[in-house]
């Protein structure tokens, strides 16, 4: 009990002379995202099994090799275990779910924040802190977004393993920490800005993957890549570091507690804001890491061909056409190796028969 009271000691978390009852956001609310995680996973499986499978069935060639399977059969197969398989259809359905969620989250975020002063002036995140009220719409926005990242951690146990799996796990953990800690000390306004700015580029990322898999829209792949790359640079490399992080580092302390020094080597309280700023910067380094991957894809695209997946779905995530070509080549080689010895024997046997006929012809007596 003593240790818990020591951990929650107000000066470690809040500005001077502020107590927990005065903070509108309540820590106990962070149990809600944990409770939401399992329902979100169930909703995901149902969404993939119905709307997602219908999209795949009519818009992609994911089921092209299975001529006799029906739409209902595909739905039932995914719902009863296909969601944990490793297949082309599974990878596309993962993209479909993330695209659907990020589209919903971005549009809902715009709706709940369209009249928010801090959307247009980041300083409003700090003016009047920590007494900012939390409207019900913002409350749900925060709870659902946090619950979604918990559901991604659960989903990672049965999703297709991607080449940047561990980077994604770090990203999800940092995001959950940022959302939870920012809610605890009522940094909710800046948290909503981070969520909104990140969701928009994820919409184009997952949308670009879907277009790439869509058999009817192959020519849209490069266009979607340009949209994604533009939104990525605008939100994660410009807005996030130069607007959000810069304001948190240079303006927050002056507007909340003027004598507070963020980079104080003696680490004077409160400590929580320093941890949040550190996590914000760490998240930005992940953005830089992924930017190098994106630039590599952009280079390949500029030298010809379609833009490939920005982040590969697995360590061996080749295009389906390439995988099929390699499989056909392997089967042809295998067939040739089986046929070649018998062919050689037939050729040798034919040559021997010719020699025998010539010898018999020479030995045969001539008729006078």
Curated annotation (Swiss-Prot):
UniProt key word Transferase: yes
Compartment annotation: Membrane
Pfam families in the cross-refs: TRAM_LAG1_CLN8 (PF03798)
Domain TLC per the UniProt entry, residue ranges: 90-303
Main location: membrane
MF annotations from Gene Ontology: sphingosine N-acyltransferase activity
Record field: transmembrane: 27-47, 92-112, 138-158, 165-185, 191-211, 225-245, 275-295
InterPro entries per the UniProt record, alphabetical: Lag1/Lac1-like (IPR016439), TLC-dom (IPR006634)
Catalytic activity field: a very long-chain fatty acyl-CoA + a sphingoid base = an N-(very-long-chain fatty acyl)-sphingoid base + CoA + H(+); 15-methylhexadecasphinganine + a fatty acyl-CoA = an N-acyl-15-methylhexadecasphinganine + CoA + H(+); a fatty acyl-CoA + sphinganine = an N-acylsphinganine + CoA + H(+); sphinganine + tetradecanoyl-CoA = N-(tetradecanoyl)-sphinganine + CoA + H(+)
Example GO BP: ceramide biosynthetic process
A GO-annotated cellular component: axon
EC assignment: 2.3.1.297
Protein name in the entry: Ceramide synthase hyl-1
Native organism: Caenorhabditis elegans
Source organism phylogeny: Eukaryota, Metazoa, Ecdysozoa, Nematoda, Chromadorea
Gene: hyl-1
